[in-house]
């Protein structure tokens, strides 16, 4: 079975910025989400962005004066982040999400794990570990913000086919295959050549996390939790350390 890291390296990373709507549109969307969160981050505060990708949230945060540690397993997406962030205070780190504690040198005021990143973890116990580690690192009043897709209730029939994006040269469609604790995500990419269409297919597993389970886990680790609607139909949990 292809891992999430392998899936991104060989399939999604080369088209990820396009998939997100293009650089400018994606950064505008990330900036709008940061505005909606109204984070109490002041200039010089340290923020961790887990699963930062090409910087959709890291760059808007850095533009607001935060010092961002951006962690991701994709070297290609991090290279794009470095190019886009320029001289902004963003440190790009290629590592596993669960290794984020080893990259903390100053107390963070917020930890972000957004864009369905948390469902890429290999098992539910890894999600619990991430929450426990975040609780240990954040000060009283610090924020852990998680956004993810709720796969706990399966889609049926043709609902499992999800158009992601298309233009005159590319078509990306996602197909979901539900298992007991995970969903098998098939990303089907068609790309036009000079005289034909090429098809590439890859799949990987995501966790079927329910909002209720995550809220309970966050609360048991000393967070007050607010649930709200996130971008593109995602669930967003804003957890504040007590």
Language model features with spans:
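Class I SAM-dependent methyltransferase SAM/SAH-binding core
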Residues: 55-100
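SAM-dependent methyltransferase
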Residues: 145-213
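C-terminal lobe and adjacent flexible extensions of AdoMet/dcAdoMet transferase-like proteins
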Residues: 211-242
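Residues lining the SAM
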Residues: 112-116
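A short acidic, Gly/Pro-enriched loop at the edge of an enzyme's catalytic core
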Residues: 102-111
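A short glycine-rich, Lys/Arg-flanked "PGG" loop and its adjoining helix->strand segment in the class I
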Residues: 128-140
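Conserved class I S-adenosyl-L-methionine
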Residues: 1-42, 44-53
């Amino acid at each position: 079975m292809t891992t999430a890291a392998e899936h991104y390296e060989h399939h999604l990373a080369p088209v990820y910025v396009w998939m997100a709507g293009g650089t400018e549109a994606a950064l505008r969307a990330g900036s709008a989400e940061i505005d909606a969160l109204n984070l109490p981050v002041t200039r010089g505060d340290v923020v961790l962005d887990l699963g930062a990708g090409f910087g959709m949230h890291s760059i808007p945060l850095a533009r607001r004066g935060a010092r961002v540690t951006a962690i991701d397993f994709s070297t290609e997406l991090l290279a794009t982040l470095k190019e886009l962030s320029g001289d902004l205070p963003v440190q790009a780190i290629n590592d596993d999400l669960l290794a984020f504690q080893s990259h903390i040198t100053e107390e963070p005021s917020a930890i972000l794990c957004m864009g369905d990143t948390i469902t890429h973890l290999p098992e539910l116990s890894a999600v619990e570990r991430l929450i426990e580690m975040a609780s240990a690192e954040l000060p009283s009043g610090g924020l852990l913000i998680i956004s993810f897709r709720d796969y706990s209730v399966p889609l049926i029939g043709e609902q499992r086919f999800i158009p992601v994006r298309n233009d005159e040269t590319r078509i990306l469609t996602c197909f979901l295959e539900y298992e007991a604790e995970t969903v098998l995500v098939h990303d089907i990419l068609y790309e036009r050549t000079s005289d034909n269409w090429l098809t590439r297919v890859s799949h990987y597993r995501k966790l079927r996390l329910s909002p209720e389970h995550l809220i309970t886990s966050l609360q048991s680790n000393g967070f007050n939790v607010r649930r709200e609607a996130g971008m593109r139909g995602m669930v967003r949990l804003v957890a504040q350390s007590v």
